């Protein structure tokens, strides 16, 4: 299954919820379950990275001498 390079946060979260429902249904084979679990781990990491990036951006905005200003946030791996 080919996927885009990265999904946005909402798409990743929706896909993760779908995977959890499939795993909880108990209807997947062992191989299918392992594949779904691996994909779920990848999606979880993508979601965590998105949340971390958003949190850091909020901190940058709030830590500018009490004034609301935005500074560029240099993220690793965005253009990989």
UniProtKB/Swiss-Prot annotation:
Catalytic activity: Exonucleolytic cleavage in either 5'- to 3'- or 3'- to 5'-direction to yield nucleoside 5'-phosphates
HAMAP family documented for this protein: Exonuc_7_S
Enzyme Commission designation: 3.1.11.6
GO BP: DNA catabolic process
Disulfide bonds: none
Function: Bidirectionally degrades single-stranded DNA into large acid-insoluble oligonucleotides, which are then degraded further into small acid-soluble oligonucleotides.
Gene3D superfamilies from the UniProt entry: Exonuclease VII, small subunit
Primary localization: cytoplasm
One GO MF term: exodeoxyribonuclease VII activity
Subcellular location: Cytoplasm
Lineage: Bacteria, Pseudomonadati, Pseudomonadota, Gammaproteobacteria, Pseudomonadales
Protein name: Exodeoxyribonuclease 7 small subunit
Group of enzyme by EC: hydrolase
Lineage: superkingdom: Bacteria
Any single Pfam family the record assigns to this protein: Exonuc_VII_S
């Amino acid at each position: 299954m080919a996927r885009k390079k990265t999904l946005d946060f909402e798409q990743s979260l929706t896909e993760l919820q779908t995977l959890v429902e499939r795993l909880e249904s108990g209807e997947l084979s062992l191989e299918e379950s392992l594949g779904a679990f691996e994909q779920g781990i990848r999606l979880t990491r993508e979601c965590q990275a998105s949340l971390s990036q958003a949190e850091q951006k909020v901190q940058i905005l709030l830590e500018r001498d009490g004034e609301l200003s935005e500074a560029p946030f240099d993220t690793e791996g965005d253009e990989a």
